[in-house]
């Protein structure tokens, strides 16, 4: 059963009417309602504000990293553990094939249902998760296997244990080491890109975002609490932070926006997975035309350009 957001109420009503018409085998009514639905979807989703896009990025039915991995990879083989502490299930690492191309996919996994959410720590990685990602990336770099990173986290885990095991160092080391990888690297924000937790697997030759994903230094809830000390200002904060794919492309903070289905990846998962696959194949072909040193030079220049602004 579909989960509807507040701004989808009209869509929900039309879809319920379609179900009733189908049970009555009223084909003319179904045709009329389906055309009405198409117009309502276009009207609703072409006029979303940033807060509504944030809601879509966090939608419980939105495809997570493992959904993309199962749809993209053949002969997938998972890498476990950081060889120092434990295996952090908030980050998954799989070697496999996309078509005939051997790849490594690193993803942040939130989990579905109470049991898996707890196992995955709600998609908030600990230091050992980032160290596992780096271990797998180093292995891929050694054999020049391209890397696809799937970003989807509210942020790195802020618990005492994570801090004791040096969370900030783990993130900083990933930024440093991923910047120096010579194999082609592509990072895609598929849902929520929260702060350093997202940055740790975002340094890449190409950084893209799905149409309804978000990428921010702080959550709108955190911003609302700090700036206004008012939890009712979340929507204002979301619209002010410039966290959407469209905003960040205009600011040249990301390279590309992947056009997931207009109605959202949560409603048309196969189409969303296909769109990401097409982007990966196209981007990888472009990166393969460059030498490893040329890729490093372009990555360096891109990173050095971050932070430029206009008055």
UniProtKB/Swiss-Prot annotation:
Q: GO annotations under biological process?
A: fatty acid biosynthetic process; malonyl-CoA biosynthetic process
Looking up Pfam families in the UniProt record yields: ACCA (PF03255)
Q: Which keywords does UniProt give here?
A: ATP-binding, Cytoplasm, Fatty acid biosynthesis, Fatty acid metabolism, Lipid biosynthesis, Lipid metabolism, Nucleotide-binding, Transferase
Might you give the EC number(s) for this enzyme? 2.1.3.15
The lineage's top-level taxon is: Bacteria
Compartment list: Cytoplasm
Hey, which pathway is this one from? Lipid metabolism; malonyl-CoA biosynthesis; malonyl-CoA from acetyl-CoA: step 1/1
Transferase recorded as keyword: yes
Q: Which reaction does it catalyse?
A: N(6)-carboxybiotinyl-L-lysyl-[protein] + acetyl-CoA = N(6)-biotinyl-L-lysyl-[protein] + malonyl-CoA
InterPro entries for the chain: Acetyl_CoA_COase_a_su, ClpP/crotonase-like_dom_sf, COA_CT_C
List the Gene Ontology MF annotations in alphabetical order.
Answer: acetyl-CoA carboxylase activity; ATP binding; carboxyl- or carbamoyltransferase activity
**One annotated Gene Ontology cellular component of this protein:** acetyl-CoA carboxylase complex
- Where the record annotates domain CoA carboxyltransferase C-terminal, the positions are 36-286
Gene3D superfamilies named in the record: 2-enoyl-CoA Hydratase, Chain A, domain 1
The record's comment on protein family reads: Belongs to the AccA family.
Recorded hits in HAMAP family, A to Z, give: AcetylCoA_CT_alpha (MF_00823)
The UniProt subunit note reads as follows:
Acetyl-CoA carboxylase is a heterohexamer composed of biotin carboxyl carrier protein (AccB), biotin carboxylase (AccC) and two subunits each of ACCase subunit alpha (AccA) and ACCase subunit beta (AccD).
Q: State the protein's purpose.
A: Component of the acetyl coenzyme A carboxylase (ACC) complex. First, biotin carboxylase catalyzes the carboxylation of biotin on its carrier protein (BCCP) and then the CO(2) group is transferred by the carboxyltransferase to acetyl-CoA to form malonyl-CoA.
**PANTHER family found in the cross-reference section:** ACETYL-COENZYME A CARBOXYLASE CARBOXYL TRANSFERASE SUBUNIT ALPHA, ACETYL-COENZYME A CARBOXYLASE CARBOXYL TRANSFERASE SUBUNIT ALPHA, CHLOROPLASTIC
Q: What is this protein called?
A: Acetyl-coenzyme A carboxylase carboxyl transferase subunit alpha
Where does this protein come from, organism-wise? Aliarcobacter butzleri (strain RM4018) (Arcobacter butzleri)
Q: Which gene encodes it?
A: accA
């Amino acid at each position: 059963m579909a989960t509807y957001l507040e701004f989808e109420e009209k869509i929900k009503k039309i879809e319920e009417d379609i179900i009733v018409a189908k049970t009555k085998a009223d084909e003319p009514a179904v045709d009329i309602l389906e055309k009405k639905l198409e117009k309502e979807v276009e009207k609703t989703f072409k006029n979303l504000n940033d807060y509504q896009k944030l809601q879509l990025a966090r939608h419980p039915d939105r495809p997570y990293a493992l959904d993309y991995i199962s749809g993209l990879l053949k002969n997938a083989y998972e890498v476990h553990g950081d060889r120092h502490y434990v295996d952090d299930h908030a980050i998954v690492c799989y070697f496999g094939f996309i078509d005939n191309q051997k790849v490594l996919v690193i993803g942040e996994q939130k989990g579905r249902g109470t049991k898996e959410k707890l196992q995955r720590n709600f998609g908030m990685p600990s230091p050992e998760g980032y160290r596992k990602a780096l271990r797998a990336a180093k292995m891929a770099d050694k054999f020049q296997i391209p890397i696809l990173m799937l970003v989807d986290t509210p942020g790195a885990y802020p618990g005492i244990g994570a801090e004791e095991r040096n969370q900030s160092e783990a993130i900083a080391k990933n930024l440093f080491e991923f910047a120096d990888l010579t194999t082609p690297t592509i990072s895609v924000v598929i849902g929520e890109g929260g702060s350093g937790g997202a940055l740790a697997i975002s340094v890449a030759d190409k950084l893209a975002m799905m149409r309804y994903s978000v990428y921010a230094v702080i959550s709108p809830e955190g911003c609302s609490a700090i700036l206004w000390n008012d939890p009712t200002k979340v929507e204002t904060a979301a619209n002010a932070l410039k966290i959407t794919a469209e905003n960040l492309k205009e600011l040249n903070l990301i390279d590309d926006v992947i056009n997931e289905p207009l109605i959202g990846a949560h409603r048309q998962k196969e189409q969303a997975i296909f769109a990401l696959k097409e982007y990966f194949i196209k981007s990888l072909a472009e990166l393969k035309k460059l030498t490893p040193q040329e890729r490093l030079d372009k990555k360096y220049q891109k990173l050095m350009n971050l932070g430029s602004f206009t008055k």
